């Protein structure tokens, strides 16, 4: 199987990567490095939205423009993204609420705390996506996720060997958006290599997320109403490629 990078993109922020005590999971570089109350082990309710095609992402690179997920991903992408959110809320004290995106540029809009969109990265088979760490992380970029529009995407494992499963990549990037860094644990979702050997968060990933937000209290991802989805553009800031790499975005 070809390996692809999963990149964690983060605005320059104070704080070094820190491994949580007695575990292999790695926390992100921001402080407090989570949503909701700043104390580790406390839950959070987090909003998310889908950026529309044409939304500016010029703070990433000159001329950058977002493409909605609906405009480059296959049918079923929305269910895959929702399932990735649910995979995390089922193992930690997290609730996700869909909101309408305000259409403002990347790192300016204040609609969804997690904003999904896509744009070209570095051609196919390299970095697949990137995700921005939680606050404090430079204005409103925190939590945003972008997919590489030059790569091919699919729903489910198998099939096209040159395409990448939306759920698996999204779940990895959400991990970054919620506060986890890359781990050296081989069979972990937060390892920087794309794989179809397992699906979703594994033991080390779950331990890390529960360290940040505590164990689950309720199921946290209600199905979005059909009417609420009409007209919403899909975008994502995930980071899978041959290897997930950390890329820094300078603060303007």
Model-derived features with residue positions:
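A short, hydrophobic C-terminal helix/tail in secreted or cell-surface proteins
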Residues: 222-241
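C-terminal membrane-anchoring or membrane-association module
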Residues: 238-252
